[in-house]
Each structure stands twice: as structure tokens, then as C-alpha cells.
Regions:
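N-terminal Rossmann-like FAD-binding beta1-loop-alpha1 element of flavoenzymes
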Residues: 6-31
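Active-site substrate-recognition segment that forms the wall
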Residues: 21-22, 50, 81-83, 195-317
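Dinucleotide-binding Rossmann-like beta1-alpha1 core, especially the glycine-rich loop
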Residues: 47-126, 245, 282-284
Length: 367
């Protein structure tokens, strides 16, 4: 470990790894404090969906920019990252949801994002295991999936950052204090510890949001695209109630990853049988044949949620302390963009997209 670094990052998940890689590429010396597995925590628990989302113009800008960065790197990604350009289909159960498909398509196309509205017949042809009678859907063909833990490890390896295998006890401008009594000194310290970031930076508006997931044995071709019910958007927007929504994702291994659930105010990471059953029942409502598949593992994780559904990226009131947290369910998608925004601001360069919507000092209003 050096006496001092240009940048010290707390957190070795995919966001911290992307920040390390981008800062190193900008010529900065980097250290990363992470006591656990690289790409553990929410990175290991997440679905790995790289997706453009349009809840707000700022969310659309960030996810579109970051998805483009993933596409640019497609040829570089090692096989273990399991990059799968399968596309997303937002599934509409009725005419009201079809109207939302058409709205989302118009927004996407206006921003240069490929999107195609599917009628019921086209949806059934694209995904024959969905239940009959669904109204249609919206295909976003350039979305993809990755295996996040391996992606995080790849990014950190590329960064050549010094790995400090100790937990951060506190973070201050230009300094990470370690639980073993040591410290990492740097020009800028970055808090990239996800759902645990308020423990290091008290007062920031980040809350834990628990989720359950399940994965099946190998059934190649059973699901061809990432499938998400449009009701997912309602559950994702709820800031108080527990919710579930159908989300099925193909893996390059042939497995099917199933979600999703959302819970606030739960600190215990244990699997809750009732919530898991509720989630799987919802999935079977959309894909009845899932009942015949064998689930081989279930787990939980904690998303880092903010009131306005946008991450905290950039300098705090003290420019020697940065935040890179609050990505909720979009940390995998937006990790590369987060790294680029952090590196550009540290170096005093112009950012590729406006940084203001994500700055930690913004006024947040719940969406």
C-alpha cells in the first residue's frame, strides 16, 4: 500500500470496480478497500440485466449511456462474464398496459433507442411459454444480460488498483479509515458501498430494499428474452409497500433466473418463504410451465434505493469526498457510466452526459 493515492474507493462491487477502472484509465493511482469477495454483496445477488429505463429523462440518459458503454466493450468481455444480447420484452397483460408499451416505444425511439411494439400473436411467437391471451409487449432488442460478479472482477483486474483487503470503518474527505486501525490516504475518497453507504456517510438518502431471486436447473431455450411484466414499474415505484412482479431472464448457461420482489424496512437477509412463494406464484401466472422446472437455488440481496430513483454520483460538499451509490436495481446497467462520471469530475473534464441530475447535493423528491 502506498502512502497516498489519487483515489481511494470503499467497496469492491461492480460500481466500485467500474470507478476504479475508469479512474485508472484516466491516469490516476487507485486503491480499493473491500474485505469480502470482489463482486459480492448486491453485485452477486443481482440479476445482471443491462437495460434502458425511462422513469425520468435523467434515468433514461444514464441507462442509455451506460448500455452503450457495455455494447462498446462486448468484444472485450471474457467468456466468464456471460454477455448475452438477448433483448428485453416488457409484457403487457391488457390494453391499458399496451398503451404504456406504445408510450415507452415513442420515448425510446425519440432518443434513438430501438424498440418495437408486439401484438399478442408476435409476443406468443417470441416467447411461446408465456400464458395465452396476453395483449402484447415491447421488445427492446439491444438490452442484454451479464454475470455481474465476473464483470466486477474483470473491471478491477483491468484497473490494476491496489486491493486493500480490509473493511472500511469510516470515510472522510481524502481518507478511508479501516476497521483494523489503518487508513488509506488519497486526494479523493469514494463511497461505493451500496446499501451500506449510509453507515460510512451518515445522512445520505439511501435505504435498503430487500429482494428475493431464484434460479432453475438448465433448460436451454425455455426463455429467449428478459421478460418483465409492465406491472414491475408500479412495484418498483412503491416506496412503502412490499411488492412482487414477474421477471424471467435467460442465462447463457441455459438456466432461468426468476424475480422479483421488493421490501423496505427489512434488515434480515434470510429467505422469507411467504415472500418467495408470492414471487414464484406471480411468475407462474405469466409462465404456467415454470411449475415443471426445478429451482436449484434461492437467495436475497439488498438494493440501495433513493427517493427519486436516481443514484448519487459525484462530489459532496467537500470535493475530496465522492459518492457512487443509490443505484437500486440498475447498478449493473449504470456501473460503467458511473465510473466515467466519477473519473471525469475528479479530473475536471467535461462529462459525456450532464452530471447535475445525479449529484449528491441535489434536492430529491420521491417519484
Amino acid at each position: 500500500m502506498r502512502a497516498s493515492y489519487d483515489v481511494a474507493i470503499a467497496g469492491g462491487g461492480i460500481v466500485g470496480a467500474a470507478c476504479a477502472e475508469a479512474c485508472a484509465a484516466a491516469g490516476l493511482s487507485v486503491a480499493v478497500a473491500e474485505p469480502g469477495p470482489i463482486g459480492g454483496g448486491a453485485t452477486a445477488a443481482g440479476m445482471g440485466h443491462v437495460v434502458v429505463m425511462d422513469d425520468s429523462p435523467a434515468q433514461l440518459a444514464l441507462t442509455q449511456y451506460s448500455r452503450a458503454l457495455w455494447i462498446e466493450r462486448m468484444a472485450e468481455l471474457p467468456p466468464e462474464v456471460e454477455y448475452l444480447p438477448c433483448g428485453t420484452i416488457w409484457v403487457a397483460a391488457d390494453e391499458e398496459e399496451m398503451q404504456e408499451c406504445r408510450r415507452k416505444a415513442a420515448v425510446a425511439q425519440a432518443q434513438g433507442v430501438a424498440a418495437k411494439v408486439l401484438d399478442g400473436r408476435q409476443l406468443a411467437e417470441a416467447e411461446p411459454h408465456l400464458r395465452p391471451g396476453l395483449a402484447g409487449g415491447l421488445l427492446v432488442p439491444d438490452d442484454s444480460t451479464i454475470y455481474p460478479p465476473c464483470a466486477a472482477r474483470w473491471l478491477l483486474e483491468r484497473s490494476r488498483a491496489d486491493m486493500i483487503r480490509e473493511a472500511a470503518a469510516a470515510i472522510a474527505p481524502g481518507e478511508i479509515r479501516l476497521r483494523n486501525g489503518g487508513k488509506i490516504s488519497a486526494g479523493v475518497a469514494v463511497n461505493a458501498t451500496g446499501a451500506w453507504s449510509p453507515e460510512l456517510t451518515p445522512g445520505i438518502e439511501v435505504r435498503k430494499r430487500k429482494g428475493h431471486l431464484a434460479i432453475t436447473d438448465r433448460y436451454p431455450g425455455f426463455v429467449r428474452h428478459v421478460l418483465v411484466e409492465l406491472g414491475y414499474l408500479k412495484s418498483a415505484h412503491s416506496l412503502t409497500s412490499d411488492s412482487v412482479a414477474f421477471n424471467a431472464q435467460p442465462r447463457r448457461t441455459g438456466q432461468v433466473l426468476l424475480g422479483s420482489s421488493r421490501q423496505f424496512g427489512v434488515e434480515d437477509g434470510a429467505i422469507e418463504a411467504a415472500m418467495l412463494r408470492r414471487m414464484l406464484d406471480r411468475c407462474q401466472e405469466y409462465m404456467p410451465e415454470l411449475a415443471a422446472l426445478t429451482a436449484i437455488r434461492t437467495w436475497t440481496g439488498f438494493r440501495a434505493a433513493t427517493p427519486d430513483k436516481l443514484p448519487l454520483i459525484g462530489p459532496t460538499a467537500d470535493p475530496r469526498l465522492y459518492l457512487a451509490t443509490g443505484h437500486e436495481g440498475l447498478g449493473i446497467t449504470t456501473s460503467l457510466a458511473t465510473g466515467q462520471l466519477v473519473a471525469a469530475q475528479i479530473c475536471g473534464r467535461a462529462t459525456a452526459i450532464p452530471a447535475e441530475p445525479y449529484l449528491p447535493g441535489r434536492k430529491q423528491e420521491a417519484h
